[in-house]
Amino acid sequence: MEQGVIEELIHLQLPEMEVANVVNVRDGNGNGNDIDGGNEVWAQHQLDNVNNRQMAILLDAPPEPPIVLHQLPQPVNVPQRLRKKRCFWTITKHFHAQPERCALLSNAWQAVQYVQPAQRSEHFANYMYKHMNSRNYPNGEGLPNRWGHF
């Protein structure tokens, strides 16, 4: 079902209204009441502007033409500016690799896991004293050879 466009002219009869022109006229006395003592040339210029048809059209005109959306220029795709790269020292990543440990410390840690938490420090010291000997580690092989090896 097609619908056609109907073009009709609609005439509205508007009631006639009287318009009062208000003109600000300077007074030489500072009262603003009369133009006798004021600047009569300036007052006449104001009246001429109101009675001038071209000036009246300019004063009645809207400040800007209406914006037609389909005539606006399309935004241009501009590549975004690269962000500042962060400093190496501020980037932190979780370290998943196990720290380097000697076999003695790994064995002591496993043995301590089965002891009550209150007695772990004493058990750890006893384990290290008992197992750190030349029979378990001949010629010191397997023992930590530098700081941080634990």
Swiss-Prot record:
SS bond partners: none
GO biological process: sperm individualization
Coiled-coil stretches noted in the UniProt entry, renumbered to this chain: none
Keyword Cell inner membrane: no
InterPro entries, A to Z: Soti
Pfam family membership, one: SOTI
UniProt keyword list: Developmental protein, Differentiation, Spermatogenesis
Protein family per UniProt: Belongs to the male-specific scotti family.
Function: Post-meiotically transcribed gene that has a role in late spermiogenesis; required for actin cone progression during spermatid individualization.
The protein's name in its UniProt record: Male-specific protein scotti
